Amino acid sequence: MKEQKLATKQNQVTEAALEVHKNMGLGFGSEEYGWALAYEFGLRNIPFERKKNVKLSYKGAVAGEYNLDFVIGNSLVVSISTGDHLTDMDEAKLKSILRAIKMKTGLTVNFSKDILEIRTV
């Protein structure tokens, strides 16, 4: 059941991101796409937190803090990218963050391509 709910959230995020990409096009920064995506989540009644500050831990000690672009329903992290393309390093970074905050699934969304680029981690 949890996997089905997570898949539904992933689909909702993907559809919202596609709508933002279709309407805004290319050339903006992550702040602008983030604002538009938050607005689209609101229109679609998708529960989210934006710029959620989390503590990164190492062996029980706080190793630093990180602001997540979005957390959807306390189970899905969404990271926004506006680079030329998503890289293995983008994926590795999100995996490390997920591990540090004890979450399992994340999406990296790149708005700077003609075709929206999304990777699931």
Question: Model-predicted segments: where are they?
Answer:
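Active-site metal-binding core of divalent-cation-utilizing nuclease and nuclease-like domains
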Residues: L26-S75, G83, K113-V121
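Nucleic-acid nuclease catalytic cores
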Residues: S81-V121
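Conserved beta3 VAIK motif of the Hanks protein kinase fold
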Residues: V78
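Interdomain/boundary linker segments immediately adjacent to catalytic/signaling cores
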Residues: M1-M24
